[in-house]
Design a protein with these regions (language model features):
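A nucleotide- and high-energy phosphate-metabolite-utilizing enzyme signature
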Residues: 1-177
């Protein structure tokens, strides 16, 4: 697929979930200059100056699909998915990206690929309350720390907190008393 063909695809048939995914996209290897040019070409696709109600409904539909797949059980200390579960990492990222898609077409200062910098920019622009951003940042940092500790325990990618019989040892390992 050529760069031109990819740009035509996104302009003519790109989906809203792809717009959200492209918020975090950036060139990291290979021809960085060409990668940057490609990302620049996608800006009109990702950062629309106006967002219609169908796009907002589509974004909400994506969230509902995630919720159905994961279930909507209240978070539990035991056996909870810190990444995809209720109140998890992806919910915070999804919130930030949705706000970016809503406001970022008219305000380039909101187009950061990082979740925490994006939330801070949304506060500066007056779109997110400072206390909401502070709570989300605290939760995001704690969840990421727990995620990393979970992965260190078994030396594999996992996002599930341990069941009750292993929880105490993990909590101590993660720095909790």
């Amino acid at each position: 697929l050529s760069v031109d063909a990819a740009e035509v695809y996104y302009e003519s048939a790109g989906q809203n979930w792809e717009r959200a995914a492209m918020i975090k996209a950036r060139p990291i290897a290979g021809d960085l200059e060409s990668g940057s040019a490609f990302m620049k070409g996608l800006r009109p696709f990702v950062w629309r100056r106006s967002l219609d109600f169908n796009a907002i409904q589509d974004i909400q539909s994506i969230k509902r699909q995630i919720d159905r797949k994961q279930g909507r059980e209240p978070p539990s200390a035991f056996g909870h998915n810190v990444k995809l579960g209720r109140g998890g990492i992806r919910e915070i990222e999804f919130y930030a990206q949705t706000q970016q898609l809503i406001w970022g077409g008219r305000d380039a200062s909101l187009r950061d690929c990082g979740t925490l910098p994006a939330l801070a920019a949304l506060v500066r622009a007056g779109h997110v309350a400072a206390n909401v951003q502070a709570d989300l940042e605290t939760a995001y940092r704690k969840l990421r720390t727990i995620e990393h500790r979970l992965q260190m325990v078994d030396d594999r990618q996992t996002h599930m907190t341990p069941e009750a019989d292993e929880a105490y040892g993990f909590a101590r390992f993660a720095g909790y008393e």
